[in-house]
């Protein structure tokens, strides 16, 4: 089918978009989680697939998403990417009852283009694009039009203009993530110790899935190695905080796979998109590793494609896809990564 991207500049209701996609496809395999789980592609699987990542941003929105999904269709498999800060005391809890469709006519929305202009998100020439018929029919929203950034036909996340260097990486050398971590704001508020009440709330969501006969794999998405180091420093030099989190989950009856350190499975910082998001080569690594551990999942994977990706694209963030960009991958994070093309991976969508 046609390759389109949905990448709104405004705070649109991603959950509604993903649920509409889910209802249309009725997938056997589903990915849940924040945008950090958005790097898992339909091409990795031999079964109908939808990536719902980005529709949930905390435990409460995850619970709401699962309720709405199960009211429509029951998948066979859920791969659930867990952001560890969803389970720590002091992090934002979320208020699902406030999840409403944003108005396109309120004052904040009408001022948004001028705010983006001041912030440098758009250039003066971009303001004229609609009048000059320069908008692309296969790109929906500001991020998709200007940055080739958004969710693709399978629901997975693409970041084209950052990948090829047309736009600067917002988290160059992971500086933004490290700065936010040091300030202790937002998701970095509070301690790294897991909160028992939140652990139990997450376990209840997993139990809901499994009680419907849905095989569920909980996994911790990757972090850049400097971010892992900064988190260990924040914990008094002790890197065991992740083990404590996984043990807390286990005590509540939830097993998990820890992919937080890319070095453990042969990846690295050059395969990251920023401090918190791995590229789709890392996504391929995670899925193949899951299949190696769970034979029932292995039979659903396109193993030949995964092997090709991991053989040809190690050390790079993305599989070439000319529908997104025809330009080669750049050293967009400024890490002195060798970004030479080593062969094209055959697209399979």
Where are these predicted regions, by residue range?
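C-terminal regions of proteins
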Residues: 243-349
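Secreted/periplasmic serine-hydrolase-like ester/acetyl group-modifying domain
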Residues: 95-212, 303-349
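Short extracytoplasmic
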Residues: 2-31
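Soluble non-cytosolic domains of exported or imported proteins
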Residues: 56-60, 73, 168, 192-199, ...
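Extended hydrophobic/aromatic segments used for targeting, binding, or gating
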Residues: 200, 204-273
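Short alpha-helical segments and helix-capping/turn motifs at coil-helix boundaries
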Residues: 12-18, 61-68, 201-202
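Membrane-embedded segments
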Residues: 26-117
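Second-shell loop/turn segments in exported
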Residues: 51-56, 188-195, 232-235, 272-273
């Amino acid at each position: 089918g046609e390759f389109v991207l949905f990448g709104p500049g405004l705070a649109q209701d991603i959950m509604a978009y993903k649920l509409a996609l889910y209802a249309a496809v009725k997938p056997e395999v589903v990915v849940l989680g924040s945008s950090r789980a958005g790097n898992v592609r339909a091409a990795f699987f031999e079964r109908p697939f939808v990536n719902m990542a980005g529709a949930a941003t905390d435990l409460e929105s995850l619970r709401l998403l699962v309720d709405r999904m199960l009211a429509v269709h029951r998948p066979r498999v859920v791969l659930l990417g867990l952001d560890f800060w969803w389970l720590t005391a002091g992090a934002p809890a979320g208020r699902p009852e406030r999840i409403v469709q944003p108005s396109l006519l309120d004052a904040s929305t009408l001022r948004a283009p001028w705010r983006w202009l001041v912030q440098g998100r758009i250039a003066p020439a971009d303001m004229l694009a609609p009048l000059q018929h320069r908008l692309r029919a296969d790109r929906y929203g500001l991020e998709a039009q200007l940055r080739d950034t958004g969710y693709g036909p399978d629901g997975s996340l693409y970041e084209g203009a950052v990948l090829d260097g047309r736009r600067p990486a917002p988290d160059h050398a992971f500086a933004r993530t490290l700065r936010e971590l040091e300030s202790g704001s937002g998701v970095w508020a509070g301690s790294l110790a897991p909160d028992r009440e939140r652990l139990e709330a997450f376990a209840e969501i997993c139990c809901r899935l499994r009680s419907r006969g849905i095989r569920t794999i909980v996994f911790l998405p990757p972090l850049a190695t400097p971010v892992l180091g900064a988190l260990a420093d924040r914990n008094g030099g002790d890197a065991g905080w992740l083990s404590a989190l996984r043990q807390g989950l286990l005590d509540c009856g939830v097993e998990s796979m820890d992919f937080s350190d890319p070095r453990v499975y042969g990846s690295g910082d050059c395969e990251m998109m920023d401090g918190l998001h791995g590229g789709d080569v890392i996504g391929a690594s995670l899925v193949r590793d899951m299949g190696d551990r769970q034979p029932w999942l292995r039979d659903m994977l396109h193993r030949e494609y995964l092997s090709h990706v991991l053989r040809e694209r190690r050390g790079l963030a993305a599989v070439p896809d000319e529908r997104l960009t025809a330009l080669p991958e750049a050293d967009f994070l400024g890490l002195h990564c060798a970004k030479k093309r080593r062969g094209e991976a055959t697209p399979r969508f």
